[in-house]
Each structure stands twice: as structure tokens, then as C-alpha cells.
């Protein structure tokens, strides 16, 4: 978090004050309980975590390491979502389904992705490694590796093979090298 968020000056800041960090660590407990087939307790705790932090992560979701929820308020991560390592997600993001379908129905977010504030990624689609999703975009189709997607509905507006969006946190969409 310290390398990505200029507001974090001390290593202790996330541990003490950042609810995104707290929500992810709390999720890890509920995920463990879910895997131990203690699903009722996992769902109960997840509900309490959602109330406390305004972050709703289903205990069955799979979340890697190096994840940053910046500001965190209003983040929703559905049951079959997968978030790989080193992903940055800003406030108001939803990784959701598209309706009442059952089974594997939520997005798969690959390594190094940055998802801008208010973005909605819906359905069992993949967002490729080091992709960038623009603020308030609605993503309904897969996004290739290193691509930038923005708009409603989202479309590919650029590609940058050198980008590391989860780390540089650059939300500027000008000069995308197309």
C-alpha cells in the first residue's frame, strides 16, 4: 500500500487506519472459515464486516496477495470472483454477476490490474494482466492483457505493454500509445 498510495507515509498506517486493509484481512478470516465448511459463521462475520467497513466480499471469493482497496467504501466482490496478486481497486467497484445464473458467474481479475472508482465488472469475464479499467466504466466483455477499457459499456481505448497500472495508479487516459 505504501508504494501505491501517496497519503501513506508510515508502514503502520494501513495496519492502524485503512479500512480497505482491515476489510481484506477480515475477509481472509471468513475465507478460511468458508474453506473449513463453517459457512454460517463465515457469512455472519462477512455481514458484520460489511456493516463495519462498507466493503462486501463474499467468503468464497478468491483473493491473492498485494491487493490494495484504496478508500474501499462501496466495494463489492461476488462469490465466484477471483482477484489475482497485486491488484489495485478504488472505491465503489463491483465485481458482480449479471442476473440469477448459478455456478461460476463473477469476474476473474488477473495480476497487476487497476480498477478505477465506481467501475462495474459484471459476469464471468476475464480482465487480463496489467489491464486498466476507467472510473465509472461498465465492463461486460473480456479485457485483454495490457489494455485500457473505459466507458458505458466499456470498450478498449488503448494498450500499453509497459504499463503496470496497479503500481503507478495513473488514471490519465491521454496518450495511450494506440
Language model regions located:
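Structural signal for interior beta-strand "rungs" in well-ordered beta-sheet cores
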Residues: 50-157
